[in-house]
């Protein structure tokens, strides 16, 4: 009986998710060593790719530029994330934006804009320690200051719930982070605990081959990637495209603003090619 009830619950979950969501975003990093077939990925229904750009300590993902070019040529939307650590968050944000801008300006064919994300998870495999909540706040505020847009915040559902409700986290800090859009990981079920956000925007339901959901509706592979990191957007495909364009950063906008006398981006540095 327990198994039967569990199966019914999973079926209901699938029906609920399919009714309002699109399984159309993939994320990648330098740990994905294969030559990614982005054309095949698009043919399988993927709309956007979010790729690691920078990680501790102040390093750059060597695959980022070439994959941005290949994904753009395949007609995919493009995003970038930074894996945060416990060092100076403003310097991290500047390093991240300079990397993204340099690769954007350095391509003949470039994406319309770049969706920006802070990877705010426990750091147990890079130097620099784990980013604190106050540092995450400083990071996203620096991104907003320089781009005019808040980035997304990525993390596991349980960790975000624990960290953001911990001692020393102020209501103001939660409020600032809630200005960002939420990308949350849960490989077992649809995320439910999203406070201070009203709901999730992207749900990473599988990574490294881990997924407890029905494979028919929640595939773990895509194109030539057998153990992909796949994500569901809370909305239709058209809604995803609108969301992406509304939140994406165009590096040329920052550069143009800074070139004008009295530009309205205080403290920003020109994101020149590196």
Annotate each language-model stretch with its function.
Residues 1-7:
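Positively charged n-region of N-terminal signal peptides that target proteins for export
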Residues 7-16:
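Bacterial N-terminal signal peptides
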Residues 22-149:
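Substrate-binding cleft of extracellular glycoside hydrolase catalytic domains
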Residues 22-29, 36, 169-274:
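Functionally critical loop-and-helix segments that line ligand-binding/catalytic clefts
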Residues 46, 100-104, 148-151, 157-159, ...:
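Catalytic cores of transferase enzymes with a strong primary signal for eukaryotic protein kinases
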Residues 58, 87, 160-162, 191, ...:
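Flexible, glycine-rich phosphate/dinucleotide-binding loops
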Residues 113-196:
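Catalytic domains of cell-wall/extracellular-matrix polysaccharide-remodeling enzymes
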């Amino acid at each position: 009986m327990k198994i039967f009830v569990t199966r019914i619950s999973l079926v209901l979950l699938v029906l609920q998710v399919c009714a309002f969501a699109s399984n159309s975003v993939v994320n990648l990093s330098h740990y994905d060593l294969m030559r990614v077939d982005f054309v095949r990925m698009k043919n399988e229904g993927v709309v956007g790719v979010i790729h690691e750009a920078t990680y501790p300590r102040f390093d750059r993902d060597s695959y980022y530029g070439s994959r941005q070019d290949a994904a753009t040529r395949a007609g995919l939307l493009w995003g970038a994330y930074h894996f945060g650590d416990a060092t100076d968050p403003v310097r991290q944000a500047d390093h991240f934006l300079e990397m993204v801008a340099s690769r954007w300006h350095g391509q003949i064919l470039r994406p319309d804009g770049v969706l920006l994300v802070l990877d705010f998870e426990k750091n147990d495999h890079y130097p620099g320690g784990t980013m604190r909540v106050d540092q995450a706040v400083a990071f996203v505020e620096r991104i907003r200051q320089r781009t005019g847009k808040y980035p997304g915040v990525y993390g596991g559902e349980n960790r975000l719930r624990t960290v953001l409700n911990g001692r020393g986290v102020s209501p103001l800090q939660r409020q600032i982070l809630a200005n960002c859009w939420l990308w949350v990981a849960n490989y077992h079920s649809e995320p439910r605990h999203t406070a201070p956000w009203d709901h999730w925007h992207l749900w990473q339901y599988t990574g490294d081959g881990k997924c407890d959901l029905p494979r028919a509706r929640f595939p773990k592979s895509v194109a030539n990637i057998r153990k992909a990191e796949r994500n569901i957007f809370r909305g239709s495909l058209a809604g995803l495209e609108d969301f992406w364009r509304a939140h994406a950063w165009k590096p040329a906008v920052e550069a143009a603003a800074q070139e004008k006398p009295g530009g309205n981006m205080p403290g920003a540095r020109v994101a020149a090619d590196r």
